[in-house]
Design a protein with these regions (language model features):
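Intrinsically disordered, low-complexity Pro/Gly/Ser/Thr-rich segments with frequent PxxP/GP/PP motifs
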Residues: 74-101
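Active-site-surrounding "flap" and adjacent substrate/cofactor-binding loops of secreted or lumenal enzymes
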Residues: 52, 59-84
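A structural motif detector for short, solvent-exposed N-terminal "entry" segments of globular domains
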Residues: 19-60, 112-119
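Conserved beta-structured recognition patch
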Residues: 53-55, 112-176
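Bacterial Sec-dependent N-terminal signal peptides
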Residues: 1-21
Length: 176
């Protein structure tokens, strides 16, 4: 019985530690392209171990409502580090998206963001699930920067938790 409990604890601890713990600023966006094919790239500033997961969405942030992603009708893409060696700070990762599917320069992806709008949109990186997340970074490319609240799929408030790691650009289709 003791051996079973020890093994269970050992395996559980190893599984839990496989996921790197990330916080605001541990990732920054380097580029985005809303013209087909949609793509974006980012740099990581923390070590990512095998199994680490990052998620991305073009949902807008609602400051007035609930300080969360409301109307979660837009897409979510999940990237997983599948390599056996850790990714080190300074590593750049690219994601490409089309109606046929999404791919990454390293790791694997599920979901797709091929509808990233050239009429203005936003892109957020987060750790966790949409209903329980840690925001890492954001970029907004609509109008004259961030709005005070989300009013449609092309608008977004700037989340306070990543204010130092959220870039607001004027209406732009592609930025490198």
């Amino acid at each position: 019985m003791r051996i079973t409990l020890f093994l269970f604890g050992f395996v559980t601890t190893n599984l839990l530690s496989a996921q790197s713990q990330l916080g605001p600023g541990d990732l920054h966006f380097l580029s985005f392209r809303t013209d087909a094919p949609v793509s974006f790239s980012f740099v990581i500033w923390s070590r990512l171990d095998h199994g680490s997961t990052l998620s991305f969405t073009d949902n807008g942030w609602a400051a007035q409502d609930s300080n969360s992603f409301t109307h979660q009708s837009e897409d979510v893409l999940e990237w997983v580090h599948t390599g056996s060696t850790p990714l080190l700070p300074g590593t750049v990762i690219g994601i490409g998206c089309s109606p046929a599917g999404a791919f990454a320069t390293t790791g694997s992806v599920t979901g797709n963001l091929y509808d990233l709008s050239d009429q203005g949109d936003q892109l957020f990186a987060f750790h966790g699930r949409l209903d329980s997340l840690v925001l890492l970074a954001g970029i907004h490319f609509n109008g004259n920067g961030w709005e005070s609240d989300r009013t449609d799929p092309h608008t977004s408030a700037r989340p306070a938790s990543i204010a130092m790691h959220a870039i607001g650009l004027t209406e732009t289709d592609n930025a490198f």
